[in-house]
Amino acid sequence: MKIRIDIPHHPYDIQIEKGCMAQAGQWLRELWQPQKVVIVTDNHVASLYAEKVKLSLEDAGFQVAVFDFLEGEERKNLTTVQKVYEFLVKQGLTRSDGIVALGGGVVGDLAGFVASTYMRGIHFVQIPTSLTAQVDSSIGGKTGVNTPFAKNMVGTFAQPDGVLIDPLVLETLGKRELIEGMGEVIKYGLIEDPELWALLTGLNGSVESILEHAETLIEHSCQVKRKMVVEDELDNGIRLYLNFGHTIGHAIEATAGYGKVMHGEAVAMGMVQISKIAEEKGLMPAGITQSITEMCQKFGLPVDYENWEVDKLYQALTHDKKARGNTLKLVLVPELGSATIHPVSLEEMKDYLVK
């Protein structure tokens, strides 16, 4: 299946197909003329797929080198970026060459940032290998790295030339790594897609059920992401809806220490906490917090952060990228399949941190 991201200045396709990673070279040849390519990945993904993708690209006429770094959110920083820059220089990459981001969200965010800043921007594509990356982070052009102050604090908007999604690679994920991706899938059902929510309701929550329906879950999620990105590429309007659960979720990730709590886990806890307080304030319908909680728990996602410290979380929130002056644009769900923006002051945000 192809989904067109029809952004006027940089349209591209998302290709979703079981087994398509084996044809990565042919796919890329249709996008780029054979040239130098660097595959950026982490050491875990490299051990599974780097050689397979490298050979496919070489068969298509590309000159390929591989850069891998130690896996983990804690490696998504400017130190790693500098190492990639140095590798690109040693390989002689020019502005006519490109990067293949092969991995999960950490790899995609970091490789995209490198591509958008090296020589003021070179071509790149995404081949996401985690559920979170396949349904969310590989699509839409947000790139970035973490700082000690906040998640993704340094970054750019830079669209890839294409996204290649192979649902079969999810079978090599560990249980926790697969389940955390469901945090984003559940979010899509809540903010925009009641049909997706109904599908999730019908699943039993097992790993087997996720893998069996992976292609459909990915397609639904990508369609929602497509709509938001095409209408609001630079995150000034409806694309903000994608941040449901992320305001508190990012604060949890930052205070826990990057890599301790996985992104989808933090999003799940953020959605539950925001909904609980918003429901108490009459801003979200009665019972929706219970529905979100039960859905997250069914798939094995955490709904409560055990190291909850209001002062630390609040401090992290003050660095949130969605803040405008003293105001945060909080995303709420007034009804299933619909989202809205609710501006709150940073002071009011303390209410949403009360357990």
Swiss-Prot record:
- Cofactor, free-text remark: Binds 1 divalent metal cation per subunit. Can use either Co(2+) or Zn(2+).
Q: Which UniProt keywords apply?
A: Amino-acid biosynthesis, Aromatic amino acid biosynthesis, Cobalt, Cytoplasm, Lyase, Metal-binding, NAD, Nucleotide-binding, Zinc
Q: Which residues cross the membrane?
A: none
Which residues hold Zn(2+)? E184, H246, H263
CDD domains per the record?
A: DHQS
* Similarity comment text for this entry: Belongs to the sugar phosphate cyclases superfamily. Dehydroquinate synthase family.
**Name of the molecule in the record:** 3-dehydroquinate synthase
Species of provenance: Streptococcus pneumoniae serotype 2 (strain D39 / NCTC 7466)
Q: Which gene encodes it?
A: aroB
